[in-house]
Amino acid sequence: MSNWYSKTKDQTLIDLETNEQHGLTEEIASERLKQYGSNELATKQKRTLWQRIFAQINDVLVYVLIIAALISAFVGEWADASIIALVVVLNAVIGVVQESKAEQALEALKKMATPKAIVKRDGELKEIPSEHVVPGDIVMLDAGRYIPCDLRLIETANLKVEESALTGESVPVDKDAIYHPSMQSDEQVPLGDQKNMAFMSTLVTYGRGVGVAVETGMNSQIGKIATLLHEADDDMTPLQKSLAQVGKYLGFVAVAICIVMFLIGFLQRRDTLEMFMTAISLAVAAIPEGLPAIVSIVLAIGVQRMIKQNVIIRKLPAVEALGSVTIICSDKTGTLTQNKMTVTHFYSDNTYDQLENLNVNNDVQRLLLENMVLCNDASYNNESQTGDPTEIALLVAGSTFNMQKDYLEKIHERINELPFDSDRKMMSTVHTYDESYYSMTKGAIDKLLPRCTHILKNGKIEVLTEADKNQILEAARAMSREALRVLSFAFKQYNSSNVDIDHLEENLIFIGLVGMIDPPRTEVKDSITECKKAGIRTVMITGDHKDTAFAIAKELGIAEDICEIMIGTELDNISDTELASKIDHLHVFARVSPEHKVKIVKALRAKGNIVSMTGDGVNDAPSLKQADVGVAMGITGTDVAKGAADVVLTDDNFSSIVKAVEEGRNIYRNIKKSILFLLSCNFGEIITLFLAILLGWATPLRPIHILWVNLITDTLPALSLGVDPEDPDVMKEKPRHAKESLFSGSVPFLIFNGVVIGLLTLIAFIAGAKFYTGDTNLFPLFPERIDEDALLHAQTMAFVVLSFSQLVHSFNLRSRTKSIFSIGIFTNKYLVFSLLIGVLMQVCIISIPPLANIFGVHALTLRDWGFVLLLSIIPLVVNEIIKLAKKN
């Protein structure tokens, strides 16, 4: 990439073979579009369909299921093989579909705004889509327009560009088209100092300019950052790690159990084919086949709920990660604040007050308002606004007193002007006022006040005394103490329109001051208080000045003392170790660069925190990637920031992050309920089969029974638990520890309930055989002593009790401490519906002959059904007794 800033205008035009007057021809532009490609940021290469499918099946659990399906098919159990294969295919389809939806959402975000560019081609100005701009195009710039590519400026008129998307600096930068010989050195000049360059995705806030396109698409400065992002890998979230660990563990357990059971069967001299099927039964029992799909579906439902809270989840695991966040690092502008400068105070005619108390009937204060509106190059109405944010704030203030710029300029026509420049820090305009002429001047108080010789007080022009100056400066200091940006205003009267522009800003008459600030969002303070209750720390990170940052932070309750702030220069001079030792006591970082943000996030994560980071600019992308949860702004955010983030806020509001955290906590809690339910049920199945084989009994459950229970009977309650109503106290709890296991404190519960379900199933198996044969021997269960019909009846009883007891057990998962009767059985209508559907389907399997043949089950008597129902409610009764005992 050439250092275009170090070349003269003529040399740049020669190198790019273009012409300032005529631009490129359409023919050459078309050729260059083919040569350089479209002027847009490339997305990460999409995975092929086969790559996506392989990613979904590349898992230990899935491999065990595939082997089980192959063995089932080999021994002629086609029903079992088909069901297992269906499970594998369904899981893969759900995963692939979910990934495709995420990609579609990304594409939609990219297309939300397709900016246009005005270029000169064949000597004519044409508006074209920005992606069609090519190197050598002559591009026109004016206020309010986004810059379509990297430009070497060749003509400017008071051009200001807001480069925060690239550099992080929110104050617009003055641009020129001048060749700077000092930039000829070998050292790379920082982007912020390349005054004769304008960069892709930055915004013109003032003036106009002409530039020649030098770099487009991925060759632009923003493209370079996008390239780095594509090379970065994403870390796994705690839930992903836990599920991956569970998957591997269960896979190995399934294989180990199969081997052990096969050896036991061999020692017991059992039939080889029977042991194959028993081993498959155990493998299937050990694996919660519906788990991946259930987790994905619950997360997807959570995503839909979050959309209603103005939160778009780009990556499903971010839902869970949000729930474990311990620190929210938030940008100030637009997220904690309203992102619009607002005039809040004024000083005029010896009066210092809030703007709402300004008196338009007071001649001095009215002239202050007129100056604010007339000495102004911005435009504003209810539908749109263009120009510098400070000037827009002045117009908004005027409009609240019914002073519209269009109307005032008709009465007081502008006849001359002296534009703002960064050296004078002032701007002046000349207007007609009845039979005379007024020059209106606004600017920084340190530049304007020394040029004032008089003051307008009580409707009269008086000499400006030292006492007056002291009073003015004290008013300015009062505004500064409240972190307000201070602007001063003056005027001068003329009898003729022949005004000497060189002396326009001399011997001025002081009118007044205004103080403005980007005020906090009204709802944010309550959200930060809620975060504190939830054990979440809010850290403000901003490029703004220390005093402004502290004023906002104090008002919002983020910081209480100035010692809780660190500025960028201090971060430069502190080691990572020192920062880590201090970071727990720092709540605000001011005047920071993108590199500082990454350093802060690293330090916070090194202390074991789960960090959420907000950002909107390209420069924020590295820190968004570095954080556990990157949150991009949907309104002001760049495509690169959105691409780097896990979450996008459609309203750019801090309160939406807090709502997302609450939703994330509830979703994680519900997913945990679903997983514990599935695993306790699977453990019950393993207990049933393991004990039966160990005792030398016939197999109490067939593979198809276990598959049915795992895929259908268990899946509906697991999904229903995944959408359990929100816990109103969830934001009163501290965040869970980053290393906390998914099963923390839950293993005894899981094992106990698994044993209960397993033993109840075995009791049903014993009773089924006894009821059918009438054998007085307690255990007529050895394969050689039980006939086929009796075994069928016993397996049917075991199958029904296993299914029903698991359905009832699902109600235990709603709360481990509160009784289901105090929560309310019907407060989760989906769970009640799942229970009814599960019972109905089970009855159909037993009662409808074709289904009974497929599942290998036997009709039950009224006595059988009564016994089954009695056994099935025991898990609920036992858990309610335990809860009551703990409570007392």
From Swiss-Prot:
Record text on activity regulation: Inhibited by cyclopiazonic acid (CPA).
GO-annotated molecular function: ATP binding; ATP hydrolysis activity; metal ion binding; P-type calcium transporter activity
Family matches, as NCBIfam families: ATPase_P-type
This protein's name: Calcium-transporting ATPase 1
Residues of the active site: D331
Residues where Ca(2+) binds: V284, A285, I287, E289, N710, D714
Role of this protein: Catalyzes the hydrolysis of ATP coupled with the transport of calcium.
Residues of the signal peptide: none
Catalysed transformations (reactions): Ca(2+)(in) + ATP + H2O = Ca(2+)(out) + ADP + phosphate + H(+)
Localization annotation: Cell membrane
InterPro entries, A to Z: ATPase_P-typ_cation-transptr_C, ATPase_P-typ_cation-transptr_N, ATPase_P-typ_cyto_dom_N, ATPase_P-typ_P_site, ATPase_P-typ_TM_dom_sf, ATPase_P-typ_transduc_dom_A_sf, HAD-like_sf, HAD_sf
Record field: transmembrane: 53-75, 79-97, 246-266, 283-303, 675-695, 703-723, 747-767, 791-811, 831-851, 865-885
GO cellular component: a single term: plasma membrane
EC number from the UniProt entry: 7.2.2.10
Pfam families: Cation_ATPase, Cation_ATPase_C, Cation_ATPase_N, E1-E2_ATPase
The keyword NADP appears for this protein: no
Membrane topology value: Multi-pass membrane protein
Keywords, ordered alphabetically: ATP-binding, Calcium, Calcium transport, Cell membrane, Ion transport, Membrane, Metal-binding, Nucleotide-binding, Phosphoprotein, Translocase, Transmembrane, Transmembrane helix, Transport
Protein family: Belongs to the cation transport ATPase (P-type) (TC 3.A.3) family. Type IIA subfamily.
Domain of life: Bacteria
